[in-house]
């Protein structure tokens, strides 16, 4: 069996920044550090940060007075932000991915201008909740759609005063179909100046598509609640190849590999490389040969952490 590695795969700039913010806060201010929601959707990362002194909570009311609080990479609503600022907290850091913040600004701009806004995204995802929560104009409207069917069933106040934006971690193909439906249903709707689906999501979907062309099966390293990891597995399955979303090498079932001559491996944007290396080692134990990395798009984007945290600290092992 041959192992093929997708390129790029794994951590993106937004995830790197979010994890660094938590690590550096622990290093500089000591444990515990409170984080609203999982800082990124990866079990290994969350468990590693818990071991170092991070406490993950869902409600601001769970944070004791005088504590340090960090918002996750997925972003928060204006209501959550206001609640946190009203508390007696020592420090408040925002680990929201800058590309999510870009979408937040688009929604806030629409709200100020009185335009109705339509968000393409998955209901219940924290990024969607945070993005929807940027709209506050009572005379306008904020709507969520997930599919072309949702678009055709949508009722708005003024079809001539609409804009749309998207969750950053969606399937490029699925989103294109929804945008086509929006443009057909509402010819005067205005989209973002630049695509809201982030570079890392797009690059990883392109890379796994190339990987699936050559692989018999594909293993996607990522947690079940990771939106972008799920989209990678779905893309492969739509190409007619088996794909399995795994948290770690321990999840690999030997029968998956029966008859496979080429095993593809990729990782979602919130999955650390150590997990990929463990998967490679496990596959070699099961008889696979050396791994070969495919060519792909180079990524050199870096997002700075807040200036208060710009010191060198140890990284997660």
From Swiss-Prot:
Reaction catalyzed: isopentenyl diphosphate + 2 oxidized [2Fe-2S]-[ferredoxin] + H2O = (2E)-4-hydroxy-3-methylbut-2-enyl diphosphate + 2 reduced [2Fe-2S]-[ferredoxin] + 2 H(+); dimethylallyl diphosphate + 2 oxidized [2Fe-2S]-[ferredoxin] + H2O = (2E)-4-hydroxy-3-methylbut-2-enyl diphosphate + 2 reduced [2Fe-2S]-[ferredoxin] + 2 H(+)
Essential cofactor(s): [4Fe-4S] cluster
Cofactor annotation remark: Binds 1 [4Fe-4S] cluster per subunit.
InterPro entries: LytB/IspH
One Pfam family per UniProt: LYTB
Coiled-coil annotated spans: none
UniProt keyword Iron-sulfur, yes or no: yes
Keywords recorded for this protein, A-Z: 4Fe-4S, Iron, Iron-sulfur, Isoprene biosynthesis, Metal-binding, Oxidoreductase
Binding-site positions, [4Fe-4S] cluster: 12, 97, 198
Functional pathway: Isoprenoid biosynthesis; dimethylallyl diphosphate biosynthesis; dimethylallyl diphosphate from (2E)-4-hydroxy-3-methylbutenyl diphosphate: step 1/1; Isoprenoid biosynthesis; isopentenyl diphosphate biosynthesis via DXP pathway; isopentenyl diphosphate from 1-deoxy-D-xylulose 5-phosphate: step 6/6
Superkingdom in the source lineage: Bacteria
EC number annotated for this UniProt entry: 1.17.7.4
Binding positions (isopentenyl diphosphate): 41, 74, 125, 226-228, 270
Binding site for dimethylallyl diphosphate: 41, 74, 125, 226-228, 270
Entry's family note: Belongs to the IspH family.
NCBIfam families membership: ispH_lytB (TIGR00216), PRK01045.1-2 (NF002188), PRK01045.1-4 (NF002190)
Functional note: Catalyzes the conversion of 1-hydroxy-2-methyl-2-(E)-butenyl 4-diphosphate (HMBPP) into a mixture of isopentenyl diphosphate (IPP) and dimethylallyl diphosphate (DMAPP). Acts in the terminal step of the DOXP/MEP pathway for isoprenoid precursor biosynthesis.
PANTHER family: 4-HYDROXY-3-METHYLBUT-2-ENYL DIPHOSPHATE REDUCTASE (PTHR30426:SF0)
Subunit structure: Homodimer.
Identification of the protein by name: 4-hydroxy-3-methylbut-2-enyl diphosphate reductase
């Amino acid at each position: 069996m041959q192992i093929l590695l997708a390129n790029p795969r794994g951590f993106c700039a937004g995830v790197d920044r979010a994890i660094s913010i938590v690590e550096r806060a622990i290093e500089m201010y000591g444990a515990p550090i409170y984080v609203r929601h999982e800082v990124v959707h990866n079990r290994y990362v969350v468990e590693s940060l818990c071991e170092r002194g991070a406490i993950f909570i869902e409600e601001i009311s769970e944070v004791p007075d005088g504590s340090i609080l960090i918002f996750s990479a997925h972003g928060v609503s204006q209501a959550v932000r206001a609640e946190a600022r009203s508390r007696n907290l020592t420090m408040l850091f925002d680990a929201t991915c800058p590309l999510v913040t870009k979408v937040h600004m688009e929604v806030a701009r629409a709200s100020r201008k009185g335009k109705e806004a339509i968000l393409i995204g998955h209901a219940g995802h924290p990024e969607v909740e945070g993005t929807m929560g940027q709209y506050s104009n009572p005379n306008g409207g904020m709507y969520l759609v997930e599919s072309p069917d949702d678009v055709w069933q949508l009722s708005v106040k003024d079809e001539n005063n609409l804009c749309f934006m998207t969750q950053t971690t969606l399937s490029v193909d699925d989103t294109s179909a929804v945008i086509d439906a929006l443009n057909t249903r509402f010819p005067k709707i205005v989209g973002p100046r630049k695509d809201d689906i982030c570079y890392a999501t797009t690059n990883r979907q392109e890379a796994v598509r190339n990987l699936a062309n050559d692989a018999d099966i594909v293993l996607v390293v990522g947690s079940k609640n990771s939106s972008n990891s799920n989209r990678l597995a779905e893309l492969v399955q739509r190409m007619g190849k088996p794909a399995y979303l795994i948290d770690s090498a321990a999840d690999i079932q030997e029968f998956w590999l029966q008859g496979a001559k080429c095993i593809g491996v990729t990782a979602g944007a919130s999955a650390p490389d150590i997990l990929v290396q463990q998967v490679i080692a496990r596959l070699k134990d099961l008889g696979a040969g050396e791994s070969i990395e495919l060519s792909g798009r180079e990524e050199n984007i870096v997002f700075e952490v807040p200036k208060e945290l710009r010191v060198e600290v140890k990284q997660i092992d």
